[in-house]
A protein has these predicted regions:
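Gram-negative bacterial Sec-dependent N-terminal signal peptides
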Residues: 3-23
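Predominantly soluble domains enriched in secretory-pathway, periplasmic, or organellar proteins
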Residues: 26-444
Length: 444
């Protein structure tokens, strides 16, 4: 009963926020215009209340749960099952290739699902039908890692500010596609020769800077992240971390990138203006090193201790998955974000034996969705639910999750699959902290 009250309260707050205007990175954080007052006696058309839905693209990595399609849950009603959107596969093809990423576009009213099978599929959110499918190259590409398709498509996609263009990673090769969100037409490519295995991505809210991550590092003489001037499609510099780069997050202006790397329970921080790694942040060794030294004693999804990192929108906390202890570990993030402080009192245990290998958050930073299927109250640091399918089965390897708001079948707000810093949320937090200090000082 307590969980239900918590969820309903969260949903009510979200509805109130939506009624005052939707906020999305795709419209630069601007609030949508309030409807003009109608003349007296005017009969207004019916407008449905906003709906808050969670879209989960399956199957994920190590998809032993046999899921297929995009599972939709109702965030306004205890995350109950709403629908499963199929990929149009024959029975003999199910569950289909692993899903490598998902993003959405407000103006196009579409979601986009990338697959290891060599395609990116666009779904019309008004009909839930396939609108178009993008295939990569016409001939075999150089690298076909982990069974990725010979056409070089596709890894994680990212919707650029404005919602009209998609930035899409090739499947572990050294270029990124620019795709028209409405039509699926290829608009161009960004070449990143020193980061040879494209994988994860984050973009600043103004669309000026992109951090393009590659599963690569010094062991193969390669960098891990390309810092790109997005309007000019130009690589500004490359960043090399201590090992191969895996999931990443960025602060509000992209001046800092935080990266999971192989062989580390924790993360590393780099300054994107200098291209230098500035700090290695590690969980206390006694908590993980013995388990990592004996992988037969513990299962590590993706083959590393930490595959999952996110930042609250206000940048007050950095969340990192800890596969060695079946938990999310949290670092407080004071000041300029260069010196996080581990806070064991905030640790969030998750389902044992099912590694939680990703994190996404709602735009308001109140709710997190993590890889083992857990739904977490971010402020309380507590699991409040589990993502489940139509049969009540927990969804595992939930690494491609979007929290979206609809009105009359039209997408009006969306999160993205990465949990990154937000300038307005950070500014509001800093103002609040300043006001609190001033009030405290005046009281003394």
């Amino acid at each position: 009963m307590q969980t239900r009250k918590t969820l309903m309260a969260t949903a009510s707050l979200a509805i109130m926020a939506c009624l005052t205007g939707s906020v999305s990175a795709q419209n630069g954080g601007a609030r949508s215009a309030s409807p003009a007052a109608a003349p007296a006696g005017t009969i207004l058309p019916y407008q449905s209340p906003p709906r808050h839905l969670i879209y989960i693209a399956t199957p994920g990595d190590e998809g032993a749960d046999g899921q297929s399609g995009v599972v939709v849950l109702d965030a306004d009603h205890d995350y109950r099952f709403v629908k499963r959107i199929p990929y149009g596969l024959a029975a003999s093809e199910l569950p289909g290739p692993k899903i490598s990423g998902m993003t959405s576009s407000i103006p196009a009213n579409k979601i986009y699902v990338t697959t290891d099978g060599g395609s990116m599929i666009a779904f019309d959110l008004k009909t839930d039908k396939i609108a178009w499918t993008f295939k990569g190259e016409t001939g075999p590409v150089k690298l076909q890692r982990r069974g990725a398709a010979a056409d070089g498509c596709c890894e994680r996609p990212y919707t650029l500010p404005g919602g009209k263009t998609l930035l899409v990673a090739s499947a572990y090769n050294n270029w990124w596609y620019l795709i028209d969100a409405q039509t699926g037409a290829k608009l161009g490519r960004i070449e990143t020769p020193e980061t040879p295995h494209t994988h994860n991505v984050a973009v600043t809210a103004d669309g000026k800077l992109a951090l393009l991550a590659s599963i690569s590092g010094p062991k193969e003489g390669a960098a891990g992240v390309a810092v790109v001037d997005l309007p000019n499609k130009k690589v500004l510099r490359y960043i090399t971390f201590s090992d191969d780069v895996r999931p990443i997050t960025i602060n509000h202006d992209g001046s800092l990138v935080y990266a999971n790397v192989n062989n580390l329970d924790g993360f590393e921080i780099a300054d994107t203006k200098t291209g230098k790694m500035i700090k290695r942040v590690e969980l206390p060794g006694e908590m993980w090193k013995a388990k990592w030294a004996d992988p037969n004693a513990h299962h590590f999804v993706h083959g590393l201790p930490s595959h999952g990192i996110g930042m609250t929108p206000d940048e007050s906390e950095i969340w990192v998955t800890d596969a060695a202890n079946d938990a999310w570990q949290i670092w407080d993030n004071p000041g300029d974000g260069r010196n996080p402080v581990y806070n064991p009192s905030k640790t969030v245990p998750i389902r044992p034996g099912i590694n939680s290998s990703w994190i996404s958050m709602t735009n308001d930073g109140k709710t997190a969705f993590v890889g083992d299927g857990s739904i977490i109250d971010v402020r309380a640091h507590r699991v409040i639910g589990i993502m489940k399918d139509e049969y009540g089965r927990p969804i595992q390897a939930a690494e491609k999750v979007l929290a979206m708001t609809f009105r009359d079948g039209k997408l009006v707000e969306t999160s993205n699959q990465f949990a990154i810093g937000d300038a307005k949320a950070r500014e509001a937090r800093l103002e609040h902290e300043t006001g609190t200090r001033q009030a405290s000082n005046s009281g003394n």
